[in-house]
Amino acid sequence: MTPRLTADFWVRAYLARLQQANIAAYVTRKGDPTAGAVLVKLATLDGQARAFQRSFDLMSGSRVWVTLTEGPEPEVDAAIARQRRNDPDLWVIEVESRD
C-alpha cells in the first residue's frame, strides 16, 4: 500500500502555498483529519464560482482534479451543500481569485 498524506496535512500545506502566492483561501468546512476528501471552491469575485474535487483516473492511475460544478456562486454553494450532506468527512476550501 502506498503511504498517503492525511487530509489535514494536505489542507495545511495547500493553504500555506496559496498564502505564499498572496491568494486568499479559507477552510469553510473541516472534514475528517485523516482521510476526508477535499473539495476546492474557486470564487472568481464576479458572482461566479467553480468547485473542484479530486478523482482517480483509471486510465493513468493517478489522482486528478475534476470540475464538480460551475456557474453562479449560489448554485455552486448549493452543490457543495449537497456534497457535504452525503459526505460528513468532506473538507471544503474556498479560494478567492479573479484568475
Predicted stretch roles:
Residues M1-D99:
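Polybasic/polar functional segments that serve as interface/processing modules
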